[in-house]
Amino acid sequence: MPAPVVLVHGAFCGGWVFERFREPFEAAGHVVLSPDLRGHGPGGSTAGVGMRDYASDVAALCKALPEPPILIGHSMGGLVAQLAATHAPLHALILLAPSPPWGVSGSSMEEAVSAMSLYALGPFWLQAIDPDYALAKRFSLDRMTREERRAVFARMVPESGLALWQTLNWWLDPFMTTSVGRVSAPALVLAGGKDVIHPPATARQTAQRLGARFETLPGMSHWIPGEPGWDEAAALCLDWLASRDQAAA
C-alpha cells in the first residue's frame, strides 16, 4: 500500500488549501491527511504560537502513523515540514514554494519588503495578524480570478506574529528557531517561475541545503496547490515518488 501523505498548509490558511491537490494522491491509493496547524481551526488562536510548536505537532502526527509518510508542505508550511523532517522518519519530503530556513537569504525585493513591513504593526510578534487582501492578491493569489481570490481570502484566518517573525526575520532570531538540521529523507522542491515572495532563486538555495531535486514550474506563481496548473504540479510529485520507489525496489 502506498505511504500515507501529510499535507502542511502555509500562513493564514488551513488544511482546506489542499482540497483539490490531495485528490490525485488519493486516486493513487494514498491515505491523505491535511490537518490545520495549531490555532488555525474554528475558534482557535495563533497568538504566541511559534514555528517549533507547529513543527512538533506535525512531527508527532508523522510518528503516530503506521509507517513513515510523505510530508508535503506549502509556503510557510514548507518550512514547518523541513523542521518536522528532522524529528520524524519520512518516506519522502516535498516542498511547494517553501519559506526558506534560517541562513537562506531572500533573492527578491518583495521578500525584503514582506519581512520589514510587519514592523509597522508595532510588536507584531505578540499578536495574531489578520490576513491582508491586497498582499494576498499581489503575492499569493495573483493567478486566480477575482471570484477565486475572494473565495480563498474569505477562508483565511489570523496568523501568529511570532511564527511570521521567526520565518521572515530569521537573522534577528538569536535562538535560530528555523535552523534546519540534517534531513535524511529524499526531497523534492518545486518553485513557481512567477513567484516573487519565494522565487526560484530562493527555493533553489533551500533545495541545495537539503540535497533535494529542484524543479521550476515556469507558468506558476506561489499558490501551487490551488492555482491553474496545480494538477500538473501534483502529477510531477507523483511521478517523482514513483521513480524513487522504483529505484529503491
Segment roles from a protein language model:
Residues R213-A249:
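Catalytic active-site module of serine/aspartate enzymes centered on a nucleophile-bearing elbow/loop
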Residues G39-P69:
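Active-site loop/oxyanion-hole signature of alpha/beta-hydrolase fold enzymes
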Residues V196-T202:
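Conserved alpha/beta-hydrolase "acid-adjacent" motif
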Residues G10-C13, S75, G193-K194:
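Active-site glycine-rich loops that stabilize anionic/oxyanionic intermediates
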Residues I72-G77, A81:
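Gly/Ala-rich beta-loop-alpha elbow adjacent to hydrolase catalytic centers
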